[in-house]
Amino acid sequence: MSFKPLHDRIAIKPIEHEEKTKGGIIIPDTAKEKPMQGEIVAVGNGIRNKKGEIHPLELKIGDKVLYGKWAGTEIEIKGEKLIVMKETDVFGIIN
């Protein structure tokens, strides 16, 4: 991938949910919930504080995270769908 987020932003590859219910019913795209879990694939350098020092991000590439349903902006790079958001939009890391 050739995308580098700036400042305190991160790029997340959403983890897709099943397209069928346990009973075998196929869920159409229009009825699917937006995924709220994903894996971080790129991170910015951090945010600059009032003293001009860069504070690095806590999240790192490979972390699996939980984020808000409407967080971030969806983009597509080389056919790969990503969500770009600020680190503060992430609720936490999934272990």
Swiss-Prot record:
InterPro entries: Chaperonin_GroES, Chaperonin_GroES_sf, Chaprnonin_Cpn10_CS, GroES-like_sf. Gene3D superfamilies: GroES chaperonin (2.30.33.40). It is found in: Cytoplasm. One of its GO terms (cellular component) is cytoplasm. GO terms for molecular function: ATP binding; metal ion binding; protein folding chaperone; protein-folding chaperone binding; unfolded protein binding. The keyword Nucleus does not apply. PROSITE patterns: CHAPERONINS_CPN10. It holds the Pfam family Cpn10. The keyword Cytoplasm applies. Keywords: Chaperone, Cytoplasm. GO terms for biological process: chaperone cofactor-dependent protein refolding. Together with the chaperonin GroEL, plays an essential role in assisting protein folding. The GroEL-GroES system forms a nano-cage that allows encapsulation of the non-native substrate proteins and provides a physical environment optimized to promote and accelerate protein folding. GroES binds to the apical surface of the GroEL ring, thereby capping the opening of the GroEL channel. Belongs to the GroES chaperonin family. Heptamer of 7 subunits arranged in a ring. Interacts with the chaperonin GroEL. This is Co-chaperonin GroES. It comes from Rickettsia felis (strain ATCC VR-1525 / URRWXCal2).
